[in-house]
């Protein structure tokens, strides 16, 4: 295997993990360790008409490719930038007569690039797609069946005039996608819109309490001169001080679960046994399953309440999928009432309920009640998450907005400031989310100052402003969680 070179990091053999990356210099919180453009990336099947196929921004009006009628772009700039990667895809779709699923499209794009450039390492690339882990040998019976279907479909889609690859190599690429696919989000970071392969990122090992985070940046093509454009990329950012020689890690999954469940999830999705400190020592497990102290409920009562919470979550998922949001609120209220005397405020079953009910009530514009639940949710999250966790920052931001809409100006402003401080580390000052949050911070600070000077006049102006302004910050509730870092084929 050929290993490339890159400033700031180097490949090494991590004990018990295989390959990994370590820092070659010292880093501090918010430092960008490296940025990487996608080797190949595609939009999810369900969003191909709503998301630009170049920068992955969600837009209302998109330009459609006049030949295949499939690809969509923000403008001519994005369409021109996409042509190198879309050219083969365009003719293949026309020949095949239909559009294959996202996995097939991504595999084809990867192999067209291999055909075009070979598998040698380019500048700044540490590893080729040929040398990424595929874990095909660990696939279960169902996964092997899905793989055979994908390979068969790929062979029908792949043009006969293109370079022909072996079945083993095609299977390897599908395995790479399965294990190394990175979720791409829209420009607001609120919705997963696609999946991409970033070879250097594939070398960064997992830790449930990592020292880095990965953020997707859609880039910016708004400047008139192309020399000022920035490209779509991922950024590996430091969450705190990282010493020279220290291994760089990210979390492949959400931390908010007990260690055994996280280990089970990692084994199922990524085929390894997590040996991080938090899993080995079961750190914070007592908080995740926390119960009230005085009086302390019996083990039998706790067991029954956990099962009741799981059953209620299933009912909630069904109601949400059917758009029955008032039913969701009713189920959450009933469950929280029963959880209250049993679970502590950090219990994951209570936090899941608080998250759902605050989100749905915000969507229904019942902001006063939503703000109460959102504050409780944030209080629990702050005791569990890493202080610079991106998901914590997003949750605090949403809670701050909910409280602002409820008229809790001081609480809302405080939360927005806290979220802004976190996102400066995890996303950086130039990310669209951080820019939006900075605008909100300035606005709430101005309103807070006005509120303290003349409360009566403030409420008159606020009422007038809200009546003339459509809601833009509360999206329709979704069964999908916040976008996960790494994409797992459903």
From Swiss-Prot:
Q: Where are the zinc fingers (MYND-type)?
A: 52-90
Keyword field contains Transferase: yes
- Give the matching SMART domains: SET (SM00317)
Q: Which gene encodes it?
A: SMYD1
Q: Which PROSITE patterns match?
A: SET, ZF_MYND_1, ZF_MYND_2
Q: How does it assemble?
A: Interacts with HDAC1, HDAC2 and HDAC3. Interacts (via MYND-type zinc finger) with NACA isoform skNAC.
- Listed binding positions for Zn(2+) 1 are 52, 55, 74, 78
Protein's organism: Homo sapiens (Human)
- Which InterPro entries does the UniProt entry name for this protein? H3K4_H4K5_MeTrfase, SET_dom, SET_dom_sf, SMYD1_SET, TPR-like_helical_dom_sf, Znf_MYND
Q: What is this protein called?
A: Histone-lysine N-methyltransferase SMYD1
The record's family statement is: Belongs to the class V-like SAM-binding methyltransferase superfamily.
């Amino acid at each position: 295997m050929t290993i490339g070179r890159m400033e700031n990091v180097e490949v090494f053999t991590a004990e018990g993990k295989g390959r990994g990356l370590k820092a070659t210099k010292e880093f501090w919180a918010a430092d960008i360790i490296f940025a990487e453009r996608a080797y190949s990336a595609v939009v999810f099947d369900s969003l191909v008409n709503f998301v630009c196929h170049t920068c992955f921004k969600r837009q209302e009006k998109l330009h459609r490719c006049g030949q295949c009628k499939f690809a969509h772009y923000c403008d001519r700039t994005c369409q021109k930038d996409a042509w190198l990667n879309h050219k083969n895809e365009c003719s293949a779709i026309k020949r095949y007569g239909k559009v294959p699923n996202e996995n097939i499209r991504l595999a084809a794009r990867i192999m067209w690039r291999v055909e075009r450039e070979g598998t040698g390492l380019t500048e700044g690339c540490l590893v080729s797609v040929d040398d990424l882990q595929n874990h095909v040998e660990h696939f279960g019976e169902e996964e092997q069946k899905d793989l055979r279907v994908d390979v068969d479909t790929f062979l029908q889609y792949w043009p006969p005039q293109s370079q022909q690859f072996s079945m083993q190599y095609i299977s390897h690429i599908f395995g790479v996608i399965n294990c190394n696919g990175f979720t791409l989000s829209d420009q607001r970071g609120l919705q997963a819109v696609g999946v991409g392969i970033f070879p250097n990122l594939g070398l960064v090992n997992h830790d449930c309490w990592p020292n880095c985070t990965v953020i997707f940046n859609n880039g910016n093509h708004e400047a008139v001169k192309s020399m000022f454009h920035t490209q779509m990329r991922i950024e590996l950012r430091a969450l705190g001080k990282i010493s020279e020689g220290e291994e760089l890690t990210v979390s492949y999954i959400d931390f908010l679960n007990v260690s055994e469940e996280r280990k089970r999830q990692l084994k199922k999705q990524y085929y390894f046994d997590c040996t991080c400190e938090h899993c080995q020592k079961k750190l914070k497990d007592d908080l995740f399953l926390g119960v009230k102290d005085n009086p302390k409920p019996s083990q039998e009562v706790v067991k029954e309440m956990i099962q009741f919470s799981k059953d209620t979550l299933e009912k909630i998922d069904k109601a949400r999928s059917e758009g029955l949001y008032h039913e969701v609120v009713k189920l959450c209220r009933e469950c929280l009432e029963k959880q209250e005397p049993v679970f502590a405020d950090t219990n994951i079953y209570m936090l899941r309920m608080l998250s759902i009910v605050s989100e749905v009530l915000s969507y229904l514009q019942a902001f006063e009640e939503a703000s109460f639940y959102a504050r409780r949710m944030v209080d629990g999250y702050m005791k569990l998450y890493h202080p610079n966790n991106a998901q914590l920052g997003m949750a605090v931001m949403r809670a701050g907005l909910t409280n602002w809409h409820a008229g809790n100006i001081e609480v809302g402003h405080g939360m927005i400031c806290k979220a802004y401080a976190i996102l400066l580390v995890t996303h950086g000052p130039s990310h669209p989310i951080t820019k939006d949050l900075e605008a909100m911070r300035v606005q709430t600070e101005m309103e807070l100052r006005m509120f303290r000077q003349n409360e009566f006049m403030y409420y008159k102006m606020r009422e007038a402003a809200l009546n003339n302004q459509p809601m833009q910050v509360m999206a329709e509730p979704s069964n999908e969680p916040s976008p996960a870092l790494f994409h797992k084929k459903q």
